[in-house]
Amino acid sequence: IIIIGSPLRKYYGGAFSYSVDYSTSYIKRMKLLLNMFKENELKSIIYRSGWNFGININDHFSIYKNLHISKREDVSHAFQLIANSKISIINYNSTTWLQLAYINFPFLLFLDKKYDLTTDLNRDILELMEKNKILFYDSKKLYHHLIGLDNKILKWWQTEDIQKTIKEIKYIFNNKFDTKEFVKSF
């Protein structure tokens, strides 16, 4: 399992970044999720931190001794980590989940309703993703779904409902960016 983490800021970074109070909320939300995992389960998880904009995730996640942390500053792209995982959890609204949908790679999206807004442009697809248990806003529901998948991730991912959802994501979003470089990593 790889968790793709959000860049966290101590300062406001402009129109395309989350507000400063997002970082505190994000860390709290992630700890709620990570606290549910048993120590032996954490051994199979890599947390991929976003850029360090004044907040070092190691300062907050060092309590999880068995959690592997990969820093964005050390390796700029997480593609190889994703390719070596069975499933990715993307915990902020980035293009990663769109790229994974494009190549049909299993992922779960873990968003925060306060910061990741639903609009007329994304409401229908987000509701469909939530209905089909690809999108979660609650850490407990996400954890139980993930544990329930056990080693049947691909079986779940290939179900008709999931594949219809992925096709819908591709139809709505994936013609918006060039994924050729991303696909080469797999």
Q: Can you say where each PLM-predicted feature lies in the sequence?
A:
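Hydrophobic transmembrane helix bundles of membrane-integrated enzymes that assemble
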Residues: 2, 32, 37-38, 89-90, ...
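Short, well-ordered alpha-helical microsegments
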Residues: 54-57, 78, 96-98
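Nucleotide-activated donor-binding/catalytic signature segment of Leloir-type glycosyltransferases, i.e.
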Residues: 56-74
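Acidic donor-binding loop of glycosyltransferase active sites
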Residues: 83-91
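C-terminal alpha-helical cap of glycosyltransferases
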Residues: 171-186
